[in-house]
Amino acid sequence: MQQNKAFDDWLASTALGGANQSYIEELYESYLSDPQSVEESWRKTFDSLPKTTALEQPHTPVRDYFRRLARENHNEAVTVIDPAAGAKLVKVLQFINAYRFRGHLEANLDPLNYYRWKVSFVPELDYRHHGFTEQDLNETFNINHYVYKRDTIKLGELAQMLKETYCGSIGLEFMHVQDMEQKMWLQSKMESLLDKPLFTSEERVNFLRELTAADGLERYLGAKFPGAKRFSLEGSDAFIPLMKEIIRHSSRQGVNDVVMGMAHRGRLNMLVNVLGKKPENLFDEFAGKHSSERTGDVKYHQGFSSDFAVDDKRVHLTLAFNPSHLEIVSPVVIGSVRSRQTRMNDTEHSKVLAITVHGDSAVAGQGVVQETLNMSNTRGYSVGGTIRIVINNQIGFTTSNPNDTRSTEYCTDIAKMIQAPIIHVNGDDPEAVAFAARMAVEYRNLFKRDIFIDLISYRRHGHNEADEPLATQPMMYSIIKKHPTPRKVYADRLVSEGVMTEEQVTEMANDYRDALDNGDRVVSEWREMDTAKMDWLQYLNYDWTAPYESKFSQERFLTLAKRVCEYPESLRAHPRVEKIYNDRKAMYQGEKLLDWGMAETMAYATLLDEGVNVRLSGEDAGRGTFFHRHAVVHNQNDGTGYVPLTHLHANQGRFEVWDSVLSEESVLAFEYGYATTDPKTLTIWEAQFGDFANGAQIVIDQFISSGEQKWGRMCGLVMLLPHGYEGQGPEHSSARLERYLQLCAEQNMQVCVPSTPAQVYHMLRRQSLRKMRRPLIAISPKSLLRHPLAVSSLDELINGTFQTVIGEIDELDPKDVKRVVMCSGKVYYDLLEQRRANNQKDVAIIRIEQLYPFPHEDVKKALEPYAHVTDYVWCQEEPLNQGAWYCSKHNFESAIPESVKLKYAGRPASASPAVGYMSLHTKQQKQLVEDALSF
């Protein structure tokens, strides 16, 4: 019994059973798929299994076989001679696993040796914790390649090797990764650290050169522009060699396009020392010089693009523009990368790389980080892995106590939600940093998943250069004042190892300073980029009133209409979906007028026919929140989906429709990044309800409404925002139209409220066909999707155009009109139906379909027949303090006679967008319609 117990203990703690049963199962399944994918020792063991063992069999017989294999003392397996030896081997394997699990906690990660990065003592990493004594250090154990590819090893040697591997300048967190192949790769990569030397003398000198550049620029700026904000990189200087090593190594692995996003910390250093921005241009920005007509932005928000030479090829680099709102640029970068990958047909995600740079407080504190990570492995948003770097200077403005900044051990613990490995690395060790860079690139390229690099460093100055950090961090900054710079630490190391002399180190710094004095580029790898890859110049200075070709061939239209209504006979659609498609067939056959869903579908179909690409995403975008779109037909037999818009013809544009993750902020930011990268794709984001779009308010305020004015970034993104008062309460009624109008100026974006299917058709086509790329805010309907009056004829689509204003449609004699009511959106139909019910002939109703840019001439033309009228009303469903009234009243008044006072008909001012009771809603709706029509 004692013998069996020893074996049971051993099996419970090794890879051959017990607590590690999942390990053996996954390893065995890998072997069944490809015997060469497992180590030779495992392969021999699996080869010895009974031939009847098969993948579809229960795993219990396999585990039982291993238990029997161990007891029968087979040569291929780890064997135990006696209970004492077996018990010791258990402890050895537990000791090894302790380092793999928890070695990072004792790693030498903090350059200051000040905070929690170095836990004082982790008991499991001491051999004595596992019951060994000093006398056991010379004992040799048979570990059968379990670590370091060794058959046998002395305990003392093993302890030293594990400490050097897992407790040096790199701390790897990877045991939360569940995929066995990834885990084994990370483990093997980490345990190869002992195979020295890792870098040549030439590479090491280059690391110092890059540290010298990082240090030299900050010193130069500090002396030349004292007190000016630059958000210095000092203390985290290793970020520059880290970035350049990632670029170099990824290029050698096939990447030819790198898109980066980062906040303000170290951004100027990045611009000059990685992307190759001319120092003299940066100095001009410090001096306040500017030549652009745009309002511009501060220097540490600016983006940049360049080409970077690696060996005999070039890598295109892009640093995204971004605001001070931390972390929001990350999903923008991911969207830009996805757009490039799609354009290049990079289905393997091997040509374009995303790198996002975070701060330690922000990566743990900003919710958009979680939202972006959640998208990372989804079909519609994945880019095949992102390298995420945290510049961890252990302080957020004035807050440095981890107990205040987060509730986790590390700031990077958020990475574990997607099982991303985390490489913690000491910022004072550039060689460890370079190793982390290469490891991250190789992992991402091999497994197409995110990986984090936690660059643990410090901030030499305050949050900005005018800030005094000693006031709030006296202890930390007393250490920083005495601590040598990363450049000094590494230079001393190279000199002591005979790689360089003191004179060479000094000469290197002098040469860099001289280059700055001359204003020359300091990045030898910089190359002038090819600007012909994507032509944006054709979209500059376009007049939004200029005409465009809106007509479409009737024959071609009907052919496309037939195809968008077809799906395979073998596909069994849901009965309601089948009816919708049958109704659409009747529409193109002229038996029915077109509804909203058909008109929208035909907008996409006709654009695709002309070679335009279309990307539509949002929560429930495939079906449509209100069951109107059905761009994807789901087979009721097997759950597969069919997208008719992807089956028009061989030369059509690309159509994508994605049901998004349940997030507004990250998804809208992603689509903004996508749209700013590809002007030839009609990019659309649809809110589930317009009410929920304010979950992405940062994106709307900082990017969509102001990106062109601040940074010159054109964007043709469409936002579809379902809006309308139908008694559904304050959370399902309003897209907050007033907020978009309040953001409008300098023709920065368009705000449209289409009221007919033909209007949405032409609005979407116009957005793509005009040579203008500015955001379109489309206030889309809900109840109008099926309203019997909200229909259009085939002719209105084929031969019509977008109307910024729609005049009176009933046969009223203008001379009989005593009041003109102007309105937008769904309320028009409430007014029309009530007027018809009243048999009124003295009130004309004018629809303004585009609220911004306001179509002054078109409105005046629509009002011309009523020049004699002195009673004008603006009617809206929204409360007085919301909707278009306050923001557009001056525009409405400019279109009517000066002597006339414009009246208001609508809900009274309200703190809430809408009431929650249907009875009260109905009463209010009836009252505002009555106010508009009665006089």
Swiss-Prot record:
Keyword Iron carried by entry: no
Gene Ontology molecular function terms on file: oxoglutarate dehydrogenase (succinyl-transferring) activity; thiamine pyrophosphate binding
Domain of life, source organism: Bacteria
GO annotation, biological process: glycolytic process; tricarboxylic acid cycle
Enzyme nomenclature, EC number: 1.2.4.2
Presence of the UniProt keyword Transmembrane in the record: no
Family annotation (SMART domains): Transket_pyr (SM00861)
Reaction(s) the record says it catalyses: N(6)-[(R)-lipoyl]-L-lysyl-[protein] + 2-oxoglutarate + H(+) = N(6)-[(R)-S(8)-succinyldihydrolipoyl]-L-lysyl-[protein] + CO2
UniProt cross-references to CDD domains, sorted A to Z: TPP_E1_OGDC_like
Cellular component aspect of the GO annotation: cytosol; oxoglutarate dehydrogenase complex
Enzyme class: oxidoreductase
Protein keywords: Glycolysis, Oxidoreductase, Thiamine pyrophosphate
The protein's required cofactors: thiamine diphosphate
Function field: E1 component of the 2-oxoglutarate dehydrogenase (OGDH) complex which catalyzes the decarboxylation of 2-oxoglutarate, the first step in the conversion of 2-oxoglutarate to succinyl-CoA and CO(2).
PANTHER family: 2-OXOADIPATE DEHYDROGENASE COMPLEX COMPONENT E1 (PTHR23152:SF4), 2-OXOGLUTARATE DEHYDROGENASE (PTHR23152)
Family, similarity comment: Belongs to the alpha-ketoglutarate dehydrogenase family.
Protein name per Swiss-Prot or TrEMBL: 2-oxoglutarate dehydrogenase E1 component
